[in-house]
Design a protein with these regions (language model features):
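N-terminal Rossmann-fold NAD(P) dinucleotide-binding loop
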Residues: 16-17
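Conserved FAD-binding catalytic core of PHBH/FMO-like flavoproteins
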Residues: 147-148, 153-228
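Hydrophobic anchor at the start of a short beta-strand
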Residues: 7, 28-30, 154
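N-terminal FAD cofactor-binding segment of flavoenzymes
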Residues: 44-80
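Conserved N-terminal helical subregion
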Residues: 3, 70-176
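Beta1/beta-strand and adjacent pyrophosphate-binding region of the FAD-binding site
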Residues: 2-13
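Glycine-rich, N-terminal phosphate-binding loop of Rossmann-like dinucleotide-binding domains
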Residues: 12, 38, 158-159
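Glycine-rich FAD pyrophosphate-binding loop
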Residues: 22-46
Length: 228
């Protein structure tokens, strides 16, 4: 038997959950499908940088993690070997902050708290995606059962193409080295972005620390990770 939903969202991470809740606020029904257990995101410590506009959207769906978010009030941008720098200040744009840094788990938790019990099919394996003239049919395995779901709109929001041959992948030959450091003195809510030939280096204020994201070619990233 084939089930029918208006919108099917593959991926129940922050992007998928935000879309689901925004659609619900507008009176649209959708279903989330995710290959991971629903609690898998609760331990993810990665830092996410969000714009002020993202905060406004999350506030509209009652999912802004106020206490967990660190505001970015200034951003210092420069290029290695280049002259000068750009300094962006929230006051120039009459904003409370240019953006915010929040841990993945805190944002995911705030969003998940607003989901209905039947909003997500967790630990689901996508078996096949078949497009039709005015719909898409998704075959999957969930809780040991085979299910067929027909939808008018299919959204990929899981960050990976999975086994879908219709999703193209571009290899940029870059890896991100991520760590956290404690600055002395404190970061004063300033973010830094430095462009280099190998890739950008970003320092994002998170609590009392900086979350460091250094984008490098794979071989150089491995060399950095091998350092003591």
């Amino acid at each position: 038997m084939t089930e029918a939903v208006d919108i099917l969202i593959i991926g129940a991470g922050p992007v998928g959950m935000t879309l689901h809740l925004a659609l619900a606020a507008g009176g649209q029904k959708s279903l989330l499908v995710d290959r991971r257990p629903q609690q898998a995101q609760q331990g993810d410590p990665r830092a996410l940088a969000l714009s002020h506009g993202a905060r406004e959207l999350l506030e509209q769906i009652n999912s802004w993690p106020t206490r967990a978010a660190t505001p970015i009030e200034t951003i210092h941008v420069s290029q290695k070997g280049g002259f000068g720098r750009t300094l962006i200040d929230r006051n120039d744009y009459q904003l409370p902050a240019l953006g915010y840094v929040v841990r993945y788990r805190d944002l995911a938790g705030a969003l998940a708290a607003n989901l209905a019990d039947d909003a997500v099919l967790s630990e689901a394996e996508i078996l096949d995606i078949t497009p039709g003239d005015d719909h898409v049919t998704v075959s999957l395995r969930h809780a040991g059962e085979l299910r067929s779901i027909q939808t008018r709109l299919l959204v990929h929001a899981d960050g990976t193409p999975g086994d879908d041959p219709d999703v193209s992948v571009s290899d940029y030959a870059q890896h991100a080295v991520i760590c956290e450091v404690t600055p002395t003195p404190g970061h004063n809510k300033r973010a830094w972005e430095r462009f280099t030939r190998d890739g950008p280096l970003a320092l994002l204020p998170l609590g009392d620390e900086y979350s460091v994201v250094f984008t490098l070619p794979p071989a150089k990233a491995d060399a950095v990770l091998a350092m003591d």
